[in-house]
């Protein structure tokens, strides 16, 4: 059995630019008549947003960090993601479980088996009534060299949060964690070259969705498809 909705996650290190492309894809789906739910992790519900504020500001060890993230995720799954998928929505989520394995696992060096146990507990508790676990059908991984990401963040106007303020070496480990996840799930995770200019990144995203048959190709004024 399959869910009526479609679940797409956006992943990448801080500074890769993924968040700025979520609304663009939402608009593309809406233009084709699809209902879209846009959300983020950690966050997406009143409770999860409170946990997000703690995670971004307060110092804590890797286990505490992981437990708070999975607590926020369970509430998010139950309150937002699963109801939206059951309605038939396209769910676009800025970060999901891959972030946890990349940041807390590879970045912090936290035990992957413990993360896997927490993942199973969280996802099984929020499983859809047909038994399907809430894993994205597609993950768009914005791959960018940590050094370039650091340059981009240095030019940002806002004050960096606790994760954004980590040293480049931390993000190198996180990037390797993402690469390992992509190698283990090549059909689900599509690499996006985030070093490209913005319009080329948008084209990569659209191409990935057209390839899946989820978006129609864009027709140019000359009558060709893109």
Swiss-Prot record:
Which keywords, in A-to-Z order, does the entry hold? ATP-binding, Kinase, Nucleotide biosynthesis, Nucleotide-binding, Transferase
Question: Which residue windows are coiled coil?
Answer: none
Q: Is-annotated flag, keyword Kinase?
A: yes
Which N-terminal stretch is annotated as signal sequence? none
Output the InterPro entries linked to this UniProt entry. P-loop_NTPase, Thymidylate_kin-like_dom, Thymidylate_kin_CS, Thymidylate_kinase
Q: Name one Pfam family in it.
A: Thymidylate_kin
Matches recorded under CDD domains: TMPK
- List the record's Gene Ontology CC terms alphabetically: cytosol
Q: What class of enzyme is it?
A: transferase
User: One GO molecular-function annotation for this sequence?
Assistant: dTMP kinase activity
* Binding-site positions, ATP: 12-19
Reaction it catalyzes: dTMP + ATP = dTDP + ADP
Q: Which GO terms describe its biological process?
A: dTDP biosynthetic process; dTTP biosynthetic process; dUDP biosynthetic process
Q: Which family does it belong to?
A: Belongs to the thymidylate kinase family.
Q: Which HAMAP family match?
A: Thymidylate_kinase
* Protein name, entry field: Thymidylate kinase
Q: Which organism is it from?
A: Verminephrobacter eiseniae (strain EF01-2)
């Amino acid at each position: 059995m399959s869910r009526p909705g479609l679940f797409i996650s956006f992943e990448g290190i801080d500074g890769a630019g993924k968040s700025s492309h979520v609304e663009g894809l939402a608009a593309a789906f809406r233009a084709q008549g699809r209902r879209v739910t846009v959300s983020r992790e950690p966050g997406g519900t009143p409770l999860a947003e409170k946990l997000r504020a703690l995670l971004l500001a307060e110092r804590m060890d890797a286990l505490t960090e992981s437990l708070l993230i999975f607590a926020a995720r369970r509430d998010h799954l139950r309150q937002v993601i699963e109801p939206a998928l059951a309605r038939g929505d396209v769910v676009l989520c800025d970060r999901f479980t891959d972030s946890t394995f990349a940041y807390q696992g590879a970045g912090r060096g936290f035990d992957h088996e413990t993360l896997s146990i927490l993942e199973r507990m969280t996802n099984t508790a929020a499983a859809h009534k047909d038994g399907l676990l809430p894993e994205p059908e597609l993950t768009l991984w914005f791959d960018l060299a940590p050094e370039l990401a650091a340059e981009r963040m240095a030019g940002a106007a806002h004050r960096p949060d606790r994760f954004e303020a980590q040293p480049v070496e931390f993000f190198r480990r996180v990037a390797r964690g993402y690469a390992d996840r992509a190698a283990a799930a090549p059909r689900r995770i599509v690499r996006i070259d985030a070093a490209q200019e913005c319009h080329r990144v948008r084209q990569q995203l659209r191409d990935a969705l057209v390839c899946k048959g989820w978006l129609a190709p864009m027709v140019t004024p000359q009558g060709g498809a893109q």
